[in-house]
Amino acid sequence: MRFVPAVCLALLASLSFAAQARMVQRPVEWTLDGTQFKSVLVYDDASHAKRPGLVMVPNWYGINGTAIKKAEMIAGKDYVILLTDMYGENTRPQPGHADQAKAATAPLYTNRAVMRKRIDEALAQLKAQAANAPIDTSKLAAIGFCFGGTAVLDLARSGADVAAVVSFHGGLGTDDPALAKNIKARVLAMNGADDKGTMPDADKFMDEMRGSSADWQFVVLGNAVHCFTETEENSPGCKYDPRAAARSYRLMHDWLHAAFSGTP
């Protein structure tokens, strides 16, 4: 009689193990204007339930192990994330080599139309993944960090049909403030109060948003500098701040939930 409980316990353990999260990392490739891009689709395949899809643009170092871990953390059981390659598969700045990252981002900062075209294409590619990933295409959004924050704000300015965009310590400036009239998404921008790189553009950004019909929020996180969500950064002007990071992630989840559910 003691054998039966043992078998039951073993069966329950095996079922529990099978139900555990398994984060999928699947390459997604496309060509745009002669450049080959290689992004990564990230999601938990323990469940086949459809969930919102997010375009995620990492910081200026682009796709690397740290960015993938962050995408997995955010995706959890809640989202399917397309971690987006904005440079092309042959351009991969090495972490810590700011000169390489600066060279990679320069053409996109110089020509914002190209930046918008590339992230618009990333959104189209995310939608296409619904054929073989559990994406609810009625619930799409974009999030970005540092350079990626700039990119997702430009996605909103392009008039993309997404429910929301969320920018973490992203650049706030634009080449054309009039584009704000195109915004359909709810816009959440979060920046550190002591971020010397982005905060000088804060007033212009708010004026830009006021001149649009967008539903927007601009959150200033006290005592935080640039890079406050970037766990590997620890320099005076670009430093991880666990308190600001945790608060910003809570704000992100709340913003996305409200946007997807149509609540204020």
Task: Give the positions of each predicted feature.
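Short alpha-helix in the alpha/beta-hydrolase fold that links the catalytic acid
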Residues: 70, 199-209
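Short beta-strand/loop motif that positions the catalytic acidic residue
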Residues: 183, 189-191
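A conserved short beta-strand
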Residues: 161-171
